[in-house]
Amino acid sequence: MTLMTVPAASIAGMVFSLVVSFALPIGLFIYAKKKLGAKAAPFFIGCGVFFVMVVMLEAAIHRIVFQLAGEALTGSVILYAVYGGLMAALFEETGRYIAMRFLVKPMDFPNAFMYGAGHGGVEAMLLCGVASISNIASAVMINSGTMSAQLASLDAKKAADTAAALSALWTTPSLTFFAGGVERLLAVVLHVSLSILVFRSIRKKSRKDLLNAYLFHFVIDSLAVLLSAVASVWVVELVVALVTGGAVLMAKYACMEE
């Protein structure tokens, strides 16, 4: 397969997603520290909880479940969406509650905000930031001719497989590469909002606020999977934005009561 030029607009989308994935969490960290008076520790607690609950524990459960019932889950979009939403809500919101109940001290609004920035921020860096770096590096190598030279040194099958994998960089619509950054922006906003809801549930001993945090997380993740099967990425992001907006409004209401 001949390598084609990766459009400049696609590379711009990759750069946009990269900047959002790293600059947004850092910006929120600075804002929470300087403007809200939050401590730095909750940010890193949020990062650590995401890594333990999602990267380690949730991923381990996924491996077991897919070994036992992988065909059943992947064979039904609805079942897969419900499963994914339940798992994400269960692990992330439970981790958020435990961390904010026992680790984040003092448990106040600024530190809840900081925790959310860390939890959502490290997710953005790992899921979108790292992928964007890889995409940009590959795109630059393709456009400069370096990648073609490297593929020439491989055996025919491996070179063809690598080229086929890289083809997404020039066949994917340029606008789609911006979607990763938009998705991460919304996700970070959601995590901050959910952290405020969980904070309020602890402060007010409100099961309703905690349940709402679980519910928002479940709904957003499930809808994203369901809509991805039938709609464009931008329709998915629009729906995610609307649900995230609901979480923001609920978190704002919680702040007004503090």
Residue ranges and their predicted role:
Residues M1-E258:
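Hydrophobic alpha-helical segments at protein termini of multi-pass membrane proteins
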